[in-house]
Every structure is written in C-alpha cells, then in structure tokens.
Amino acid sequence: MSIKPLHDRVVVKPIEADEISAGGIVIPDSAKEKSTKGEVVAVGPGKPLDNGNVRAPSLKVGDKVIYGQYAGSSYKSEGVEYKVLREDDVLAVIG
C-alpha cells in the first residue's frame, strides 16, 4: 500500500465481521453491516494548530480502533479496501 495520510488523518484497514454468528448461523454478505472496527496502517504527521505548532497524533500504526459507520472516505488499493479518517472520527482504541 502506498498512501501517506496528511495532517491529522489516519488510514484504517477494516476488520471484517465474523462469517458465522455466535449461535452458529452463517451470515451472508448481503446481511453484513459495514465494519466499524479496524487496524491503523498509516498515520499522518499531526494536526496543525493556529499558533504554527503541530499536535502529534495520539494513534499509532497497529492500534485497533472503533470509528463511526459513515466516517471518512473509502480507498481501494490492490483489492484491499481502506478508510481514510480524521483522528477525531476515531471513537475508541480497543485494548
């Protein structure tokens, strides 16, 4: 993947939902919801502040995150879909 996010943006590779439910039912692709979990694969240099400084990003490559379902923009590279999000669109870091 050759994408470098700018400013306070991060690139997230969505983590696909399970193919089988907890009860053992196979979930067809048409019934799956869009993933809202993913792994950070690239991080921008940080958010430029009004005073000229740059606020360092709080996320790092490898973090597993939860983000809003409709947040960011989709980007496809080599058959893999990624989301480009603002750091503010990330709701939480998972364990």
Curated annotation (Swiss-Prot):
SMART domains for the chain: Cpn10 (SM00883)
Pfam family name, one: Cpn10
CDD domains membership: cpn10
Location, primary (coarse class): cytoplasm
Keyword Magnesium applies: no
Cellular compartments annotated: Cytoplasm
Highest taxon of source: Bacteria
Keywords: Chaperone, Cytoplasm
Function: Together with the chaperonin GroEL, plays an essential role in assisting protein folding. The GroEL-GroES system forms a nano-cage that allows encapsulation of the non-native substrate proteins and provides a physical environment optimized to promote and accelerate protein folding. GroES binds to the apical surface of the GroEL ring, thereby capping the opening of the GroEL channel.
Subunit structure: Heptamer of 7 subunits arranged in a ring. Interacts with the chaperonin GroEL.
Family from the record: Belongs to the GroES chaperonin family.
Protein name: Co-chaperonin GroES
Lineage of the species this protein comes from: Bacteria, Pseudomonadati, Pseudomonadota, Gammaproteobacteria, Lysobacterales
